Regions:
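The feature captures the ABC ATPase H-loop/switch
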Residues: 85
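Conserved G/P- and acidic residue-centered "switch" motifs that form tight phosphate/ATP-binding loops
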Residues: 82
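N-terminal beta1-alpha1 cap of cysteine-dependent amidohydrolase-like domains
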Residues: 1-79, 89-97, 101-145, 151, ...
Length: 173
């Protein structure tokens, strides 16, 4: 998508403090933080330790969390998708459910392992766009269908962030 509109995508390696963030941020117009099979480590949001075997990526956390805050402070647009969205919340002081599917009242947002990959990443549920937000402001309808594959989810929204859309179970997406 970036190339289609005349931009040049740049992959930022997960090198933490080895990256000169100020230099990097002076040379980009926006950041996209994509999904990943790994989860944000719970110590970043004062959560309980994860179950043994939970996949984390400390190098990514040490790169993305400070980079998100620095980009926003400079007015650089940031888009978080899947894990990237969870990172945005944590970077600003929010907390996550580690396993949304184990929280009463929430549906299972993980990929159904017993279905083909093409269906796993297909449209999964409705998303209710909230009035007054950016998504509503660009003309999205009140309800859209989305794919939704994640184990973690927003437990407490970070100060300064606002809800743009909700899953049918009320989970912020």
């Amino acid at each position: 998508i970036v190339s289609v509109v005349g931009g040049m995508p740049v992959i930022i390696p997960a090198l933490g403090e080895q990256i000169d963030q100020q230099y990097l941020l002076q040379h980009i117009d926006g950041l996209v933080f994509p999904g990943s099979p790994s989860n944000v480590e719970p110590h970043h949001y004062r959560g309980p330790a994860s179950d043994a075997g939970t996949l984390h990526d400390a190098a990514r956390d040490s790169t993305t969390l400070p980079l998100i805050k620095a980009a926003i402070a400079l007015g650089i647009p940031v888009l978080g998708i899947c894990r990237g969205f969870q990172e945005m919340n944590v970077a600003f002081g929010g907390a996550l459910h580690q396993k949304v599917h184990e929280v009463d009242g929430y549906m299972d947002h993980r990929e159904p392992e017993d279905t083909p990959v093409g269906q796993q990443y297909g449209l999964r549920h409705a998303l209710h766009v909230q009035p007054g937000g950016l998504l509503a402001g660009i003309g999205l309808p009140d309800e859209i269908q989305v794919n939704s594959i994640h184990g973690q989810g927003v437990q407490r929204l970070a100060p300064g962030l606002r809800v743009e859309a909700l899953a049918p179970d009320g989970l912020i997406e």
